Amino acid sequence: MRSRSMVGWLVGCLTLSSAASAQSPGAEPPPRPFLRKVIQLTDAQLAAIERGEVVTKQLPSPDKPEIAAFGAVKVNGTVATLRERMRDFQTFRKVPGIPEIGRFSTPPRIEDLQGLTIPDDDLDALRKCKPGECDVKVGTAGLGRLVKEVDWKAADANAKATALIKELMTAYAKAYAAGGTDAMGVTVDKSKPKALSEEFKTLLRNSPYLVEYVPAFNQYLEAYPKGSLPDTDDVLFWTKDTFGLKPVVSMYHATIHMPEGTRGLLAAIKTVYASHYFNAALEVMAAVPTPDEAAGPGFYLLDLYRTRIDPPTGMLSGVLMGKVKGGIEQGVAMNLKNTKARVEGK
């Protein structure tokens, strides 16, 4: 079963959870039917979730460049606390493996990137970059300025390049904040240029569950920043992570929404740019309140992460792709574990 159907159930759990008390006696409350029938978790895995353990699974994807992973955990806390923690992304996403993180102002300012250091390997790669052949994801205009404005033979070349990269990132953040998805760039690190806006739109096209279950949320994501949606928070932030073989500098747009008529929460974290590996990514998280309020506050946190990458090539491509998929699944597990700890105050 393709991930689009799976997430349809995931998002639908929010609506169903609000009516859980009206179910027939003996019926399983959300999200258990989804976890059992759609994700096909075993009784042992469902029991592990009830014990507060993180359970993850790799999902099928529509084509080779797209990878998907799902995870779930039961959290002893309130959805309101989750929303409060998620609003503070500098703390919420600050975990081992993300040594640098920052939030953009409105509008973005170059000072917002004060805590960012550019990896030495990226600076070395940029010295040799040319369109269609670069070890860093970069756009035509940015690459042109790095070639023309930085004297790579000078002693201060790395400092000049770092300052220019931050200037380019700030301009990119401003363009995205003003123009949304259509303002996302075109990378020219490979022989075939990649339009990041089209890569993200492909993820949305493969995600009709947003249209079916939360059309207002989907429309808001598509139209951002032109539309408005009640009970919604938007955060534009950046990170440098060290999870992979290379440090990755990324820019994200997080949207946190409390759907009307539910007690749950829906969040979408969109990758606006990544210096390596990722052409687009969309993470959808749903907090589904537990039906037994008498037992105390609690909710199930469901996480679906989907990304489009440049697939590995060559004789070891299958092995490398397996490692990439495993790494993404581990990332989902780590996110759920850290989120649970943040909400529970551990």
Regions found by a protein language model. Give the residues of each.
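N-terminal secretory signal peptides that target proteins for export/translocation
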Residues: 1-3
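Sequence-pattern detector for short linear motifs
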Residues: 5-7, 35
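Bacterial N-terminal signal peptides
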Residues: 8-18
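Terminal "cap-and-tail" regions of soluble proteins that handle hydrophobic small molecules
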Residues: 23-75, 79-81, 91, 96-346
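A short alpha-helix/helix-coil micro-patch that ends at or immediately precedes a cysteine
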Residues: 85-87
